[in-house]
Regions:
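Nucleotide-activated chemistry modules centered on ATP-dependent adenylation/adenylyltransferase
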Residues: 1-23, 45, 50, 54, ...
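N-terminal, positively charged, Ser/Thr/Ala/Gly-biased leader segments
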Residues: 23-45
Length: 261
């Protein structure tokens, strides 16, 4: 059983962290997501949504159930239990149908949320999402923020090249892109990869959506850029052996709610 305590906010120098105490294998760890002070008000302590999304692939891969002290959004839990978990388990060789123990809430926690965001990783997929949003004629879907979430991609993907150096270069270029488009650049940090110690390819979708839900009081819409894996390449069979982006169309649908799409 993985036990996740009620989220709370801690200060870390000039930044603030959304933190939860996690008990796994009889060891307690602090799991945190850090943002600059101006985003503190958007960190969500009232729900466990972010931490459930983030821990789910680990629990399913290692046969663990999940207990959460803070409530979960009822719509989100319903989608996970009735659609996401059965679909993944039935199309894999090794995944476990984790049981989730949590109270639920039906109230929309981010009523009045106004943010529209997407990642700014400097990849072709994120550039497409930025271009599509900025020039769409539907103005309520125009971007308000570009984001850089440090949730494990650099540590796995660029470990041989030097993750700190590569991240610094990407950040510098990403800030320039944000400035050229007149958008704020939201830069966060997390110890996600220390808690969910799995190859990032298997969890990248969950890692990014964990970050999104940590700030769910900000977002009404978030674009998850997913290169190459549209309807024509959707793949669920043996999903535990492949990049989680292969089934983003399922994951993103199941992990959307009335308050956050």
């Amino acid at each position: 059983m993985i036990q996740i305590g009620r989220p709370y906010i801690e200060q870390a120098d000039k930044n603030f962290r959304l933190t939860a105490d996690v008990v796994m294998d009889q060891e307690t760890k602090k799991w945190w997501f850090e943002v600059p002070a101006e985003y503190k008000q958007y960190l969500c302590t009232e729900r466990s949504d972010a931490f459930l999304i983030g821990i789910l692939p680990l629990a399913m891969r290692f046969g663990e159930d999940i207990s959460l002290d803070a409530p979960v959004t009822e719509e989100l839990l319903f989608n996970i239990e009735t659609e996401l978990i059965p679909s993944l388990v039935n199309s894999s060789k090794n995944l476990y149908a984790s049981r989730i123990f949590a109270e639920t809430e039906t109230e929309i926690i981010n009523e009045g949320a106004w943010g529209v965001g997407t990642g700014n990783s400097m990849g072709v997929d994120s550039f497409y999402a930025i271009e599509m949003s900025l020039h769409n004629h539907c103005k309520s879907y125009h971007l308000t923020h570009l984001c850089h979430y440090n949730v494990g991609a650099f540590n796995d993907t660029y470990s041989t090249a030097g993750e700190d150096e590569v991240r610094e270069i990407c950040l510098r270029n990403a800030k320039q892109v944000a400035e050229e488009n007149g958008l704020p650049m939201l830069i966060s940090n997390s110890n996600y990869e220390e808690i969910v110690d799995i190859n990032h390819l298997f969890v990248n979708t969950y890692a990014n959506l964990y970050a999104v839900y940590c700030l769910q009081k900000l977002w009404k819409t978030y674009y998850l850029a997913s290169s190459e894996f549209g309807f024509h390449r959707f793949q669920l069979e043996d999903n535990d052996m492949y990049d989680s982006a292969h089934y983003d169309l399922l994951t993103v649908n199941c992990l959307s709610t009335r308050g956050l799409k």
